[in-house]
């Protein structure tokens, strides 16, 4: 069981995974531990993950998120971002202070199910956004 810092974050994630067996069956996509540590660990395996995903899925952008998607696998991305300030902005309506960004929270994991191939455009467009249930369903069902 995950211990979300805020109950409303758990409430936010529940409907995203409803069609995928529920939140509990998808805990492997989430890791609430320190984002910097997760990023350092990912950087050590990034190239290997990229090769394995290309071998398994081919040279395809699994996100198809940007209107001008090139549909080529150029990068590895996290489906659920390692960290994001989206919920702090939208749910808690936090504002940035004097040139500082709204604080980010740690969410995504380095589990293989959370890795996707993407083109540069889609990866750049998605940034730290948490995908909606339609994109989650498409990618996790490997229907791209």
Task: Locate the predicted segments by residue.
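Hydrophobic/aromatic-lined pockets within catalytic cores
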Residues: 54, 80, 84, 123-127
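Hydrophobic beta-strand residues in large extracellular and virion-surface proteins
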Residues: 49, 61, 76, 115-117, ...
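Short, charged surface segments at domain edges that flank catalytic/cofactor-binding sites
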Residues: 13-65, 96-109, 113
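Cys/His-rich metal-chelating microdomains
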Residues: 60, 64-72, 121-125
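C-terminal/domain-terminus segments
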Residues: 2-13, 127-144
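Compositionally biased, intrinsically disordered low-complexity segments
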Residues: 7, 14-16, 48, 52, ...
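Histidine-centered nuclease catalytic patch
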Residues: 66-117, 130
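Intrinsically disordered, low-complexity peptide-like regions
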Residues: 1-7, 76, 121
